[in-house]
Structures are given as C-alpha cells and as structure tokens.
Amino acid sequence: MQKRELIYEGKGKKMYATDDANLLIAEFKDDLTAFDAQKRGNEAGKGALNNKISTQIFKILKEKGIETDLVETISDTEQLVKKCEIIPLEVVVRNIATGSLTKRLAIKEGTVLPFPLVEFYFKNDELHDPLVTDEHCLVMGLVKSEKDLQTLRHLAREINSILFKFFEERKLKLVDFKIEFGMDKDGNILLADEISPDSCRFWDADTNEKLDKDRFRQDLGSVKVAYEEVLRRILS
C-alpha cells in the first residue's frame, strides 16, 4: 500500500491518502496536548503505544460485532483504515464523575454514576467543542436523522458495556472515554479514530492511580510508563 499526501493532521494523528481511494493511513504521533492545546508536550514512544492499545481494543470490539474503520496495523505507529466521513461529534461515555462533569454539575469527584452517561460534543476547536443536545445536532445538521443519533447512543453504550467488563477483569476502572464515528461510502456508521489512554480515563482498581493522559494534564509523571501498564493489562 503506497502512502501518499498528508490530508489531515490532528492533535494525536496524521492521516495520509493511499493509492486506494477507499483506504487511508493513520499515523499516531508522540505529541501530547491538553486544555485546548494550550499545554503541549512530547514523549517518545507514546504514539506507538497508542497504536498498539487502540488496535487491540478495536479487535476486541470487532469480535463482539462492533464495526470499525480498522483494516490492519502496518507499522509500529501506523494503521490502514477505511476512508469514512467523520461525524462531527465527540461521543463521551462517563461511568465515574471526574473532569468537566464535576465542574459543570458540582458532582463529587469519583462518584459512581447510577448508569453510563452519554454526551455529545460538537467537534469545533474555535468553539472549544461545546456540549450539544440531540436537537442541536439535528438543527445544525451534524447528523442526518434522529435515527443516526439513536444509533450513536446505542453503539456508545454497547462499546462501554463490552470494555467496562473487559477492563474490570484486568483491575482497571474505565472512568470515561471519548469516541468518534464515521460513515462509509455505503452509509454504514463505523467506530473510527482511536480508543487509547489519550481518549480514555483509566484508574487502577485498587489504588485509583491514573493511567491515562491526566498524568500529562496534572503533571503526575510519565505518560509512557502508564500507557505501557495499560497495554500490559490488555494483553494479560
């Protein structure tokens, strides 16, 4: 597969065209960002770890019937993925209160929520990715129909159900996570982007030690060491 021109660069990945119009190459970066990219850093090996972790998680989900954009891993930092039109929503699933939820609603940090909370955020850097309702999504044309919203919410809950149990068995609390979806050329909704410690919060089940990008946000120590531990538990 021939890598061609760079078509998009985000905070954590670069996307390249290939000689197949239906496939792209996603390259994971070592860059670290937080607080709308106001805080920046870099840790060698982080991109390769995210590639390995996300690949494993997508394979687990695929085995459970969740359709994804992943075709195969082609190098330490690269994946071959299906080209799809990314739906401009970040879908966040929360199991335990932390981060912006505690600030917005004054819910005590660490509160176990009575059920998984699914939220939609409009992907827009200038607006700082605001929280949006179903009706906002429809008015703004972020999705094509109410049925698509129902599909996104159903998939998010299903993914959470699968991964919560998987990580619980490996002594990790899946606190919350952000996922993105795309639509392929046939109109099918696919899980896209990544699921990694860059986009999830993982706490050790016994100590509540943070094993995710909050280590960078809060200056808690090496991100790479934490990500290596997450990968070790996934593979255990």
From Swiss-Prot:
Enzyme Commission number, as recorded: 6.3.2.6
One matching Pfam family: SAICAR_synt
GO BP terms: 'de novo' IMP biosynthetic process; cobalamin biosynthetic process
Keywords: ATP-binding, Ligase, Nucleotide-binding, Purine biosynthesis
InterPro entries according to UniProt: SAICAR_synt/ADE2_N, SAICAR_synt_PurC, SAICAR_synth, SAICAR_synthetase, SAICAR_synthetase_CS
CDD domains the record matches: SAICAR_synt_PurC
GO molecular function annotation: ATP binding; phosphoribosylaminoimidazolesuccinocarboxamide synthase activity
Pathway participation: Purine metabolism; IMP biosynthesis via de novo pathway; 5-amino-1-(5-phospho-D-ribosyl)imidazole-4-carboxamide from 5-amino-1-(5-phospho-D-ribosyl)imidazole-4-carboxylate: step 1/2
Keyword ATP-binding appears in the UniProt entry: yes
Root EC class: ligase
Family: Belongs to the SAICAR synthetase family.
UniProt protein name: Phosphoribosylaminoimidazole-succinocarboxamide synthase
Organism in which the protein naturally occurs: Campylobacter curvus (strain 525.92)
Gene: purC
